[in-house]
Amino acid sequence: IAVAGLDIDKLLLGARKCDKDEAIKYAIIRNELYSQGYYIESFTIYEEKMLYFTEWLKQLFAETQGKDNKGILPISVLNTRDLHSLGQYYQEGKRIIFETVINIVKERKNIKTNYGKSLNDINNIACDAVAKAHYNGGVYSNIIELDELNEETIGYLIYFFELSAAIGGYLLHVNPFDQPGVSEYKRIMMEVINND
């Protein structure tokens, strides 16, 4: 992370600022939704810079909670790119999906458009419109809004989601710190490799 030019101290400061009560509440909400038949969580972003962060979220939640025939399947969505393709299902499809939206309210580059609004403004308008449409359609949404994207907010999010994933594992009565499914395919691979 430091090699990429990020300030580690700010990342750790953000983690220390994490509201642990909110992280616990998020874990409880996820567990309650799971008990009601919501088996897929969409991590939805409107900022392309967050794309690999949502890939990490998929790994985090799948590995900590996807075991013993339990767990919520994490997927990632980049809006507005995915609005037309997945928006129809979210709005009117089977109610097995809930979403966690991570929206960056202010982005550093604020390019103006012919509509008198910046791209950042249009992204925020799209996020609000989708949230209202999903609310009207009965889609459950957790919305996390960040003022801006920087090392401190990323540190906050990392700790928030790591804590939530661990607590959520315990709520499901699974060990959030092992990966027996991953270990199994690795064992089979090594067996085949060593026998050739």
Residue ranges, per PLM feature:
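Active-site phosphate/pyrophosphate-binding segments
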Residues: 1-99, 181-196
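Short alpha-helices
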Residues: 1-16, 121, 125, 132, ...
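Glycine- and acidic
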Residues: 39-44, 71-72, 112-116, 142-147, ...
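Helicase-primase coupling helices
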Residues: 75-150
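Short, surface-exposed linear patches
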Residues: 63-68, 96-99, 120-125, 164-168
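Short flexible/disordered coil segments
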Residues: 22, 45, 103-111, 158, ...
